[in-house]
């Protein structure tokens, strides 16, 4: 057999230089993969079938020697590169030349060699592994050789298919993932729901990387890994195959499964929960798995935030995932292009968009975002614009007016508030009534009402601005019938107005508790301030009334005795004499004194309530937010402060309690004096001589100096400066994100006026309007009808149950099927009487699994835009090392394919030359024969 010139041995030196050297390098590498005559130690073996694109030149000794040298050289280089092989594989395990050639061909993308070996070499072990424990399928997937992967997947009993799938998912090889998912092992879909740890328990190496276990975490399923890697196409493919991420149980779950995992390996259990939540919080999984991704993301973000406070060791991980869910919702809102899409996200339903009879959006998703403090979502321009349009409902023209015009409107509303209330009472559905129901007008009316209330508090004290006319010890009266003490008189008209405002605010708070529920009401700190303020006002007025009642009782005694003209000559009873004493002689627990003290506290709280409306202004809003954050820092600081303060207070009291009257002042001699001295020492208002003793007890005095000095250093220099640093840090955080913080606070303020009701401000809300009475009658009618229907339904169910029991006794119902039907009916009756939590959850899920049609269309559009945007962002990244490696592997595969084609063409050419030679040799013979 003649050799082709293209593959003949190269003799002598050729002037081609580099081209010839490159050809020889390629030739040596190609022969390395095709050698079949050398054993593992380089010795000749029995001839094996030749695979690939080289013909067998067994007749050429020079070629054989050259190939042996090439094999030894390349094998030595490979072993040098894979030097630490014994660290990973068993020393007794060795590969045959055939297996090495097979693995190398799979790794480098030599498709012709792999195809021929799979077809012709029946003794080949396709599950053989290299020194790292990887088989041919794993090597082909790792180097993105799709054709080789498809060839290997056709073989039966192929191992580690699951690990190859996980590897392809981690590298983002979509076509390879689709090819592997077409494997018969994934036909039923059970494999996709099985984690590697479950496969190991079944003695299965489906997900195993090598004999030591899996490549990834034992709890990572294909869908979880795809979600981690943000592979949208792969997640979509797996979801179509039926794969889902199972939501972890509650952290405090005590089921057998959770208890067993916690006892076996608590760390692995925690990591498995985090991996599952990472998959659930992935934008790829959120956008493709849920029909209501906004609600799912909001609920999941809150759940992760709660877990961050429970599992402190993984706090940063959970907070990061929670923020990821919030960013996903913000990303969807950012992709909205019209008002309908914004309303769909904020409301969750566009077909039943209007709430109540007034056509105002319910904004259920936005309420949830405010509750879970998704600040970027609430402060987003699309959301703020929607809120602003609702805020100026029925007053759209006022939005474009200047501040001067708005101020005049506010002033006009404040002055005409009684007239506006009368109009709303008698004509709530008129044009003016609709304007009064608008959020902006409600805000202005309530703010004006509260401003009037503060004015009443100021005016109530106006009679004492220049001092009191009666001295504290004055007891003389002009007449015996004027026994009332100073300020122990009946309530003035000013105080009656204040009381009416307080009663109106109490009624408004009661309605709010009824609407929101006690839990939601107590969750808001402003409600706690209102509750405290109103409770103190009520206690003050009650104490004042008690003082007035006792004084009136004493006065009634005087009124009953008209003969009493001069009280100085009459012996009075204690109940009368007590109320004739001067103020300086009053009892400390006197109701009048208690009333005045509580009233002063309530006035301070009332003026602090102004901070509630400050977020409405862009200038004062951030300041109010910073003030609130500062108060929180002070409360945190108080824990350390009180601990240090109490320690020094008790210590100094124990040191100086034996020296009462033996000091220059009374500091530290009592607990009260110790508290005063140490408290004012924080502000530098205590004297150093507070520790000086009049006697020559220098040891005690020195101890006092040391403790007092340590206290000042600790409190003033250390703790006080630490508090200042905390306040500065909080203020800087607010300042860095002032716009978002202010818009979020403003949205919370606006939302309190979006709800229906509470149209009339205090105290006009005390008078029920005809509209309120009408709605009350409708609710009573509905409640009575529901109650009647419920009793009627209960009677029908009881009658059916009695009938079934009678039929059962008579033998009519005797089969197993009928008995099961009876038990089912009992269960249904029980569920009708008291729905279980599970049934309510199923109803909740079904409501989201079957959303309105228009809403579903809108969410599809938004999700499609989000996925496309994510793909664009991913493609816009710079070419990294992994992508360069993929290009290199593609070039390598193309090289082998071209060489195979070249080899095939060479063989065809050699065959044609041989046939042509035979024909040419036959022609002379025929001529001789003819001759």
UniProtKB/Swiss-Prot annotation:
The listed locations are: Cell membrane
> Which residue spans belong to the Extracellular compartment?
460-487, 543-592, 658-706
What regulates this protein's activity? Activated by diacylglycerol (DAG) in a membrane-delimited fashion, independently of protein kinase C.
Mutation: residue 360 to H; reported impact is: In FSGS2; uncertain significance
Quote the annotated effect of residue 218 to L: In FSGS2; increases calcium ion transport
Q: Where is this region: Disordered?
A: 1-26
UniProt's post-translational modification comment states: Phosphorylated by FYN, leading to an increase of TRPC6 channel activity.
Return the ANK repeat spans: 97-126, 132-161, 163-189, 218-247
What main location does UniProt list? membrane
What GO CC annotations are associated with the protein? cation channel complex; cytoplasm; membrane; plasma membrane; slit diaphragm
Which reaction does this enzyme catalyse, per its entry?
A: Ca(2+)(in) = Ca(2+)(out)
Q: Which UniProt keywords apply?
A: ANK repeat, Calcium, Calcium channel, Calcium transport, Cell membrane, Disease variant, Glycoprotein, Ion channel, Ion transport, Membrane, Phosphoprotein, Repeat, Transmembrane, Transmembrane helix, Transport
Q: What is the effect of changing residue 132 to T?
A: Increases cation channel activity. Increases significantly inward and outward currents and does not show channel inactivation. Increases calcium ion transport
Q: How does it sit in the membrane?
A: Multi-pass membrane protein
Tissue note = Expressed primarily in placenta, lung, spleen, ovary and small intestine. Expressed in podocytes and is a component of the glomerular slit diaphragm.
Q: List-wise, which residues carry Phosphoserine?
A: 815
Q: Note the superkingdom of the native organism.
A: Eukaryota
Q: Name one Pfam family in it.
A: Ank_2
Q: Sites of glycosylation? A: 473, 561
Residues crossing the lipid bilayer are 439-459, 488-508, 522-542, 593-613, 637-657, 707-727
Q: Which disease is it linked to?
A: Focal segmental glomerulosclerosis 2: A renal pathology defined by the presence of segmental sclerosis in glomeruli and resulting in proteinuria, reduced glomerular filtration rate and progressive decline in renal function. Renal insufficiency often progresses to end-stage renal disease, a highly morbid state requiring either dialysis therapy or kidney transplantation.
- Describe its partners and assembly state: Homodimer; forms channel complex. Interacts with MX1 and RNF24.
- What does this protein's UniProt record list under function? Forms a receptor-activated non-selective calcium permeant cation channel. Probably is operated by a phosphatidylinositol second messenger system activated by receptor tyrosine kinases or G-protein coupled receptors. Activated by diacylglycerol (DAG) in a membrane-delimited fashion, independently of protein kinase C. Seems not to be activated by intracellular calcium store depletion.
The UniProt entry's sequence similarity note says: Belongs to the transient receptor (TC 1.A.4) family. STrpC subfamily. TRPC6 sub-subfamily.
Quote the PANTHER family the UniProt record gives.
Answer: SHORT TRANSIENT RECEPTOR POTENTIAL CHANNEL 6 (PTHR10117:SF7), TRANSIENT RECEPTOR POTENTIAL CHANNEL (PTHR10117)
* UniProt protein name: Short transient receptor potential channel 6
